[in-house]
Curated annotation (Swiss-Prot):
<feature type="region of interest" description="Disordered">
    <location>
        <begin position="522"/>
        <end position="545"/>
    </location>
</feature>
<dbReference type="GO" id="GO:0016887">
    <property type="term" value="F:ATP hydrolysis activity"/>
</dbReference>
<keyword id="KW-0547">Nucleotide-binding</keyword>
<protein>
    <recommendedName>
        <fullName>Thermosome subunit alpha</fullName>
    </recommendedName>
</protein>
<dbReference type="InterPro" id="IPR027413">
    <property type="entry name" value="GROEL-like_equatorial_sf"/>
</dbReference>
<comment type="similarity">
    <text>Belongs to the TCP-1 chaperonin family.</text>
</comment>
<keyword id="KW-0143">Chaperone</keyword>
<dbReference type="GO" id="GO:0051082">
    <property type="term" value="F:unfolded protein binding"/>
</dbReference>
<keyword id="KW-0067">ATP-binding</keyword>
<feature type="compositionally biased region" description="Gly residues">
    <location>
        <begin position="529"/>
        <end position="545"/>
    </location>
</feature>
<dbReference type="Pfam" id="PF00118">
    <property type="entry name" value="Cpn60_TCP1"/>
</dbReference>
<dbReference type="InterPro" id="IPR002194">
    <property type="entry name" value="Chaperonin_TCP-1_CS"/>
</dbReference>
<dbReference type="InterPro" id="IPR002423">
    <property type="entry name" value="Cpn60/GroEL/TCP-1"/>
</dbReference>
<dbReference type="InterPro" id="IPR053374">
    <property type="entry name" value="TCP-1_chaperonin"/>
</dbReference>
<dbReference type="InterPro" id="IPR054827">
    <property type="entry name" value="thermosome_alpha"/>
</dbReference>
<dbReference type="InterPro" id="IPR027410">
    <property type="entry name" value="TCP-1-like_intermed_sf"/>
</dbReference>
<comment type="function">
    <text>Molecular chaperone; binds unfolded polypeptides in vitro, and has a weak ATPase activity.</text>
</comment>
Length: 545
């Protein structure tokens, strides 16, 4: 700098900046910290995490997406890893822990290459070459099947390790039944809209009391005690308008000078409700499910006619009811005809736990169904709900794709072996990155073994030996403390879950590697008395975020 030259201040006072290798190192450490936080939850023998929020509410789970969503993460790079988990969960419903653990390991391997002087861009290019080759290998080794036995295995794999205990077989059957019920074929392609599977939960009973309903469960009771508890051969009217006297849009007053006219006025109101109920009765409906309110007088006349009615049904439930029963939602009672009514074998009010619910059951060819989860505590039913939602998603995408892969780390072991060989055919320093990618994949079988208390080194050696012999379905056998044939054990993973996890991990790893400058603005209202680093986050002089 020339003598007397005044330094130019570009950033505001208090802004902290990290550049070059320091920025890269801190970003990598943050990503590794997040990966390590969920790594012990991977696989059927993975451990659970207890999460306590600021008001003392407790969540016990080993679901990666749930854990990361509930964690209070501040580091910007750590937040990027959490976003990977969210993206994986949104796209395919499972494999969140795998994606995060792979992200952390890819960055760990990249750190070694950075120490050797390999440029981040070269590492990123090598990783992209590796993931493209991995996609080809996965397509080659994928198995084809959409039969119920395969779908059941997919469900069991998704449920394993969750807090569903001895109920996995039972729950897997419910999941397959639900997915098959809502599956449709459009233009020769199988489509499964999992939004048409309603998952409800109620405390009480055991997990084995969980029910599949060929129809929809509504968390509402009938509006009048005199209405029937059970309606057989139900003809269902779905009404999106209030069975009430409409209020005028302008303020109006009615002045009655003759006291005898008061009764006439009340009679007119009563007649209006009678006409409403008469229209419903004339259509042939014996069940009314209304999205809006039902007046007390209308309730009385509906009960008098033996018509079962529920009010203020959620819009989402109304849409599912239409798909399940074949009914059309009407907004005007004049449009209520026999042709717009839905059908169900039974509509029944049942007491579930402390609540009364309406069951619309026995729908013919329903395109929307329900699963009602039972369990002893809030923690149990919530974890079963998370497990079922994951299982439903992965079974649905397997049904759509018609392909699956062998689980237990078998795919990662096969990819690691083939990519190591592929690296030899690639010139330049990208070869080193592809080799690092192959080595990073071994974190999955290694972690599965570690979490089960099995020697990871011996397991990896045996696994490599089996795959060198061409046995692509051999993975980590957690039951026999070694390696085994996943085909014989029925351990399978959906193809889309694996490919998406790989792609997401590579995307975030390459993005983080290319960051060489972190500029953090000063907090406007920093918490008093805090200094140093946030607990659990890596240090190395990283500014607080």
């Amino acid at each position: 700098m020339m003598t007397g030259q005044v330094p130019i201040l570009v950033l505001k006072e208090g802004t902290q900046r990290e550049q070059g290798k320091n920025a890269q190192r801190n970003n990598i450490e943050a990503a590794k910290a997040i990966a390590d936080a969920v790594r012990t939850t991977l696989g059927p023998k993975g451990m659970d995490k207890m999460l306590v929020d600021s008001i003392g509410d407790i969540i016990i789970s080993n679901d990666g997406a749930t854990i990361l969503k509930e964690m209070d993460v501040e580091h910007p790079t750590a937040k990027m890893i959490v976003e990977v988990s969210k993206a994986q969960d949104t796209a395919v419903g499972d494999g969140t822990t795998t994606a995060v653990v792979l992200s952390g390991e890819l960055l760990k391997q990249a750190e070694t290459l950075l120490d050797q002087g390999v440029h981040p861009t070269v590492i990123s290019n090598g990783y992209r070459l590796a993931v493209n080759e991995a996609r080809k290998i996965i397509d080659e080794i994928a198995e084809k099947s959409t039969d119920d036995a395969t779908l059941r295995k997919i469900a069991l794999t998704a449920l394993s390790g969750k807090n569903t205990g001895l109920s996995n077989d039972f729950l897997a059957d419910l999941v397959v039944k639900a997915v098959n019920a809502v599956a449709e074929v459009r233009d020769g392609k199988t489509i499964v809209d999992t939004a048409n599977i309603k998952v409800d939960k109620k405390n009480g009973g055991s997990v084995n009391d969980t029910q599949f309903i060929s129809g929809i469960v509504i968390d509402k009771e009938k509006v009048h005690s005199k209405m029937p508890d059970v309606v057989k051969n139900a003809k269902i009217a779905l009404i999106d308008s209030a069975l009430e006297i409409k209020k005028t849009e302008i303020e109006a007053k009615v002045q009655i000078s003759d006291p005898s006219k008061i009764q006439d006025f009340l009679n007119q109101e009563t007649n209006t409700f009678k006409q409403m109920v008469e229209k419903i009765k004339k259509s042939g409906a014996n069940v009314v499910l209304c999205q809006k309110g039902i007046d007390d007088v209308a309730q009385h006349y509906l009960a008098k006619e033996g018509i079962y009615a529920v009010r203020r049904v959620k819009k989402s439930d109304m849409e599912k009811l239409a798909k399940a029963t074949g009914a059309k939602i009407v907004t005007d009672l004049d449009d209520l005809t026999p042709s717009v009514l839905g059908e169900a074998e039974t509509v029944e009010e049942r007491k579930i736990g402390d609540d009364r619910m309406t069951f619309v059951m026995g729908c013919k060819n329903p395109k929307a169904v329900s699963i009602l989860i039972r369990g002893g505590t809030d923690h149990v039913v919530s974890e079963v709900e998370r497990a079922l939602n994951d299982a439903i998603r992965v079974v649905a995408i397997t049904k759509e794709d018609g392909k699956f892969l062998w689980g237990g780390g078998a795919v990662e072991a096969e990819l690691a072996m083939r990519l190591a060989k592929y690296a030899n055919s690639v010139g330049g320093r990208e070869q080193l990155a592809i080799e690092a990618f192959a080595k990073a994949l071994e974190i999955i079988p290694r972690t599965l073994a570690e979490n089960a208390g099995i020697d990871p080194i011996n397991t990896l050696i045996k696994l490599k030996a089996e795959h060198e012999k061409g046995r692509i379905s051999v993975g980590v056998d957690l039951d026999n403390n070694g390696v085994g044939d996943m085909k014989a054990k029925g351990v399978v993973d959906p193809l889309r879950v694996k490919t998406h996890a790989l792609e997401s991990a590579v995307e975030v790893a390459t993005m983080i590697l290319r960051i060489d400058d972190v500029i953090a603005s000063k907090k406007s209202t920093p918490p008093s008395g805090q200094g140093g680093q946030g607990q659990g986050m890596p240090g190395g002089g990283m500014p607080e975020y």
